[in-house]
Amino acid sequence: MTKEMRSFVPILINNGYREIRSNGSHFIYSNGNNQITVNKDLNKMVRRRLIKENNLVER
């Protein structure tokens, strides 16, 4: 798990997402309505895109 992924997980949790499963190199998070698939080798650019596309709040 990369540094970016370790810092992204708390953002997901603070926005109501929880890990529902992992398969190979991907983690699947859901908040009941939306689902986000995150690669374990997440990089900075993809992290920023996921935050923007899913309207996540960084706290």
PLM-predicted stretches and their roles:
Residues 2-23, 28-59:
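Basic nucleic-acid-binding interfaces
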